[in-house]
């Protein structure tokens, strides 16, 4: 099992954001996570990725307990996340945003001080080549030299995914990749996710766009009030009476 989340609990004051969440993502699996606003989905992502600490429970990745490991330490193991609101540097070009996300550039940024000039040049060339590879994969060549602040919402979501790809992930937590994205770029994102998954990269995806998500993932979990309400195939889950009441407003 690539990711195992067991009995995770987290409270903020008197509000129980996560109340014993247990779920898993197997090696190379595509798994979806839906639920109403305030269900605890993004809080769960923040716990799993190391941005906040749980009050109880356990997160294991590739068999090892992540404990209190930092987001950077988890990223080095191949566990990375995106954010619903992309966190690009708006004054940097797309290419330079990708280069800034490479190991040794952020989080470990003093590494260059201990390299000989020739080694620095070689590292820079390797990072640039990797950035160009990601740009080609994401079909962003036509905007590669534009400041990222000029990108559309969908292009920023592609760039957010690209920044994660600079770190060689084995499992990506995607936080609402289709939110605010036009249908054409949703299709582009879906195809890129499928292609990455075919290469063996696993995904746990939070999303409100049920149409896009349910044709992408074979396994779906529904959260409500900090708990897993239902799990199964998209067809099974969306026929569950509890899900229809909590998430679909009782719609038939």
Task: Set out the residue ranges of the language-model regions.
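Conserved ABC ATPase "signature" region
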Residues: 110-143, 191-194
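Catalytic Walker B motif of ABC-type/P-loop ATPase nucleotide-binding domains
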Residues: 172-176
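The feature captures the beta-strand-to-loop junction immediately N-terminal to the Walker
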Residues: 34-36
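Conserved ABC transporter NBD signature motif
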Residues: 57-64, 76-77
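Helix-to-loop junction immediately C-terminal to a conserved catalytic motif
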Residues: 49
């Amino acid at each position: 099992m690539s990711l195992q989340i067991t009995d995770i609990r987290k409270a903020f004051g008197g509000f129980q954001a996560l109340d014993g969440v247990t779920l898993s993502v197997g090696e190379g699996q595509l798994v979806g996570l839906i639920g109403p606003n305030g269900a605890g989905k993004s809080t769960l992502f923040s716990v799993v990725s190391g941005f906040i600490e749980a009050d109880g429970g356990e997160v294991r990745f590739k068999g090892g307990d992540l404990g209190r490991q930092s987001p950077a330490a988890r990223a080095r193991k191949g566990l990375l996340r995106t954010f619903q609101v992309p966190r690009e540097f708006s004054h940097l070009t797309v290419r330079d945003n990708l280069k800034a996300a490479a190991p040794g550039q952020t989080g470990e940024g003093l590494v260059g001080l201990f390299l000989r000039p020739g080694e620095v040049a070689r590292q820079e060339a390797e990072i640039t080549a990797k950035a160009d590879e990601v740009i080609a994969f994401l079909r962003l060549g036509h905007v590669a030299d534009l400041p990222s602040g000029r990108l559309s919402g969908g292009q920023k979501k592609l760039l957010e995914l690209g920044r994660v790809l600079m770190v060689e992930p084995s499992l990506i937590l995607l936080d609402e990749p289709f939110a605010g994205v036009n249908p054409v770029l949703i299709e582009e994102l879906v195809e890129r996710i499928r292609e990455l998954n075919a290469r063996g990269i696993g995904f746990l995806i939070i999303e409100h766009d049920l149409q896009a998500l349910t044709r992408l993932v074979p396994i779906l979990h529904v959260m409500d009030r900090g708990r897993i309400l239902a799990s199964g195939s998209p067809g099974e889950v969306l026929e569950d009476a509890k899900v229809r009441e909590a998430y679909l407003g009782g719609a038939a």
